[in-house]
């Protein structure tokens, strides 16, 4: 508690210098890499493999954006005081968060369209492909199909358990929970915050933090001149 109070006291007293000092430490960069890497592992290992929620085209694009941020965080964490490494990390983090927001917004629009009672809501909505085209034409679906090959339909993320599969009691509980809510929600019984919205929140928070940190760094460099 005293540690947190100390951080808050430093931030209030010298905000720019404190923010610059924070980004010159490995903690924040590793935190970003671990957080985004953890979300990728959670989506793949728990929801896709354990609960049989097949990823759609936009889902694997979101994973790509998170993976870029993981790489950026790791590169910057090698030596955050090195301007080149930190700049590479910042560019990768900004790119990943912006692209992630873009993919999440598109998936959210598709989700609302397919779950809308009005059939006209689907008019003009582009469907999902099982043959993704990643930025820079990266063949991620060929390199790591388990992680980046879409096998589901956009907007439909309820568990689909293959015939003949025997579920454990824990699996059955989660599968029933998400099937009854007709998809993934942060709070399934109340349909609160679908997967696309949760991803938007994660990317948005990262983007805000990056903007604040980069702004402080730019001010520090400007003052140094």
UniProtKB/Swiss-Prot annotation:
GO CC: one term? plasma membrane
Q: Which InterPro entries does this one have?
A: DiS_bond_form_DsbB/BdbC (IPR003752), DiS_OxRdtase_Dsbl (IPR023792), DsbB (IPR050183), DsbB-like_sf (IPR023380)
Q: Does the entry annotate any disulfide bonds, and if so which pairs?
A: 56-59, 128-154
Topology class, membrane: Multi-pass membrane protein
The UniProt keyword set, sorted, is: Cell inner membrane, Cell membrane, Disulfide bond, Electron transport, Membrane, Oxidoreductase, Redox-active center, Transmembrane, Transmembrane helix, Transport
Q: Name one Pfam family in it.
A: DsbB
- GO biological process terms held by the UniProt record: protein folding
Organism superkingdom: Bacteria
Q: Does the keyword Transport apply?
A: yes
What family is this? Belongs to the DsbB family. DsbI subfamily.
This molecule's function is given as: Required for disulfide bond formation in some proteins. Part of a redox system composed of DsbI and DsbL that mediates formation of an essential disulfide bond in AssT.
Give the quaternary structure: Interacts with DsbL.
Q: What is this protein called?
A: Protein-disulfide oxidoreductase DsbI
Q: Which organism is it from?
A: Salmonella typhimurium (strain LT2 / SGSC1412 / ATCC 700720)
The gene behind this protein is dsbI
